[in-house]
C-alpha cells in the first residue's frame, strides 16, 4: 500500500459505506495508521493529523484522526467508520491546510469552526462527536475525501490562498499561480 497523490482519479471518486467491520476493514485501518506515520517520518516539519481510506486508493468510508495533534510523539489514531456531518455551526474561518495526497501545496481554506459528526468506532460503537476549531477542520477535510473533494477545490480560483513550504519549514505564497496552481495538470488531473 502507498499514499496516492493528485492527479490520481480515485481521489475524485465517492467512497462506499462500510457494511461490516471485519478483518479486511481492520487491516485497512492498520495500513492507514502505518502509512500516516511513514509519511510523517519523511516530512520532518509536518505532522500527519489524519488520513482517509481513498488516499490509499481504497474507496471505503473510513478516516483516521490523530488523538493528539499537538504531540508528534503520540502516534495513536482513532478510526471513524462511515463518518457523516450532521451539521456545521459557528463562523467560517480561514486557516492553513495541507494534504498527504496533494504534495507540496498548502492553502488557506475556509471552514466552519464547529461541526457535529456521527460515525462508528473500530469496535462498532456508534458515536457522535462535537468538534471545534482544528478538530472540526480536520474532520471536514477528511470527510471531503470520502466524497471525492480535495481542499484545493474550495480555493481553486483564489490566487492568494495557495502556499508552498520552503526548506526551513515555513509556508510562503506560491510565486506563479497560473503555472503552479491553475494550469497545473498534475494538481487537477483531467477535467
Where are these regions (language model features)?
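Positively charged
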Residues: 1-191
Amino acid at each position: 500500500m502507498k499514499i496516492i497523490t493528485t492527479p490520481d482519479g480515485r481521489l475524485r471518486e465517492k467512497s462506499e459505506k462500510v457494511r461490516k467491520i471485519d478483518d479486511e476493514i481492520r487491516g485497512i485501518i492498520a495500513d492507514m495508521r502505518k502509512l500516516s506515520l511513514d509519511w510523517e517520518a519523511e516530512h520532518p516539519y509536518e505532522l500527519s493529523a489524519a488520513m482517509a481510506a481513498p488516499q490509499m486508493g481504497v474507496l471505503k468510508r473510513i478516516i483516521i484522526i490523530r488523538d493528539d495533534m499537538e504531540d508528534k510523539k503520540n502516534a495513536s489514531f482513532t478510526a471513524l467508520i462511515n463518518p457523516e456531518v450532521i451539521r456545521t455551526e459557528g463562523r467560517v474561518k480561514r486557516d492553513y491546510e495541507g494534504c498527504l495526497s496533494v504534495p507540496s501545496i498548502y492553502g488557506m481554506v475556509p471552514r466552519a469552526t464547529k461541526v457535529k459528526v456521527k460515525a462508528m468506532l473500530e469496535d462498532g460503537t456508534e458515536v457522535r462527536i462535537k468538534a471545534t476549531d482544528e478538530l472540526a477542520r480536520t474532520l471536514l477535510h477528511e470527510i471531503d475525501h470520502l466524497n471525492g473533494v480535495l481542499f484545493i477545490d474550495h480555493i481553486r480560483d483564489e490566487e492568494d490562498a495557495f502556499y508552498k513550504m520552503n526548506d526551513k519549514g515555513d509556508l510562503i505564497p506560491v510565486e506563479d499561480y497560473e503555472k503552479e496552481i491553475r494550469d497545473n495538470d498534475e494538481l487537477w488531473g483531467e477535467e
